[in-house]
């Protein structure tokens, strides 16, 4: 009888299991972020992915917020990316939660997702309590600020920190977060960012101590005209929505032992001095009035440590000198213990990204450590370095516990590429590794060592590559806000954002304000940048119109003192033998960049149903295309006939249909005869070339150029020991740079054949391009719906796509 009951129970359980849906939702996000505590919107957007053990499509969803705030009810829709909240507007500081469930086409519902936290930040007319405070101004000193306070009860405790400069927060001696270099960047003369931390696990009933360590970072007189010679901070800690403590004159402060050694201008990022003997010597803080700077919520992920890199080699190179090789170039914080020192002993630490024989402090910086005689441990706190090699001077015993903490903005990744060609794999990995190192602090820099600026040209060059391999919509939203804040009253834009001082570039650099929002929309189905910054795009094009002569953009002036930009570049950092200074080439490149901006404005106006704008920009585009061809086409060549001069007109629709074959043939002929089959272009040309060869199916030509081992080329870099992409093809200046990362998307969209037909990859075409000699390829590309994987062996192609993505059948 017992055996019969057991068998019946098993049958019942199996039957129940068969009735359960075999799908679930995962990776829930609000505004593109995982459980954000302080968003800047009262009506956010929700996204989720679906895991299923068999093919399916979402037929309906249901979202609950609160759950008392909003219940969508069952909504018949397959939408699962950036689904808008439709309840009553949320309020400033409101903390709530949300969840979702879905139905498949057979009417079966998934389980509800786990509840996800959702918090609204300090928005609208709400303001943080308290005042900006600082301490120990001058000499680059970082400060430690503290306050004892008492709470009557514990609960949900949130700490809001708005710092001008970097900060770290400690409650009762414990660091409140594993984030580093907080907050993200902003245009600090216009906007600062508020970061919120959940400190519920650290607060206790009764007396507590809150400490804030702050370092000036970008907030300096020489960069953003700082009103105080040091970092400042305003902070507030709430328990269950009730303020418990905030920054004001009752706090005390002192020196935490760190000092900034640089002015944060080009070649001047220096490093940090740490005096391990320092005592805070507590004194009253300075209260500083800050006006005309908007404080808004940080809407991108923080920087976090992604990898701990340890040395591959270390040797003594002098009586008190030690050389360390970490094996690859990284953007990192150094951590080291230094034994055998006496109090007051000084150790200098030098860095190099290029050579074990050359340590230039103006390139990769340096640090200084002053020993206490015991517990001598150094770690970067408010600065970082680009390095492969480290040289210690003043240390007689070998350094111990050496680690490099490679960090970046904590976005989601998951891309991979492999093929039958190890050299091609090496190029892909070089580019991917470089981009990850350069995407930190809520923007992407040219190089983190020499200039550390968010150049628009470098951004345009790498945007499609980075957005192909990572979930960086929040990062681009933060970066684009800095561009909008940098715009001048006449509509002019600088070449970098944030914009602490003048920097070189040209119209292609400024067009980031147009190109980046369109790419964010196509790659993530996120309309926020497009909608938020559309007025800035139009204002910039009005500025451009002022310097249009006979239908063509011409040289614009260097703005008056203080200048916020210089130069009027076409292409940049092209190899030797390519004249990027040719005036006709410069005008052609800049007018093609303008045509590309008009193309994207037409598309964005379509999406936003702005019919008059769409018609206006379409007319401007067609007129400009005609003028470019009439002006720059001569006997089969455009302008100087360089690769970028030939390809950019092809990309933006300038070349008449009847001339395309002739122009392409001439391009290839000149590549062989003038450039020996090599890439022969620079920062602007690489992404332009990549996008054109992908669209045109020119995989054999591209593959042939990438396979060249001599100068210039990626294999030339690798053959000469590169572990990051160089700033110049010949290796000058930075060895970890954003100039030439524009080829990254080609591995996925051409060789993998993954082409987005609808925003966010909701509908795709999968048609791998097959260059001769490449036997097989396997790629995985992350999308807002989940990963797409494509495998090609010979002519045979297989793929898997996530739920929510449909594949267009090939003809």
Task: Give the role of each language-model region.
Residues 11-19:
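Hydrophobic h-region of N-terminal signal peptides that target proteins for export
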Residues 2-11:
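Sec-dependent signal peptide recognition
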Residues 229-232, 246, 250-276, 297-302, ...:
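Non-catalytic C-terminal accessory modules of carbohydrate-active enzymes
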Residues 23-449, 474-475, 494-498, 528, ...:
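Extracellular/oxidizing-compartment recognition motifs
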Residues 157, 161, 333-351, 393, ...:
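Alpha-helical support elements that line or immediately flank enzyme active sites
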Residues 166, 232, 246-253, 399-430, ...:
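Active-site acid/base region of carbohydrate-active enzymes
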Residues 269-274, 450-451, 469, 513, ...:
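C-terminal capping/lid segments that line or modulate ligand- or cofactor-binding pockets
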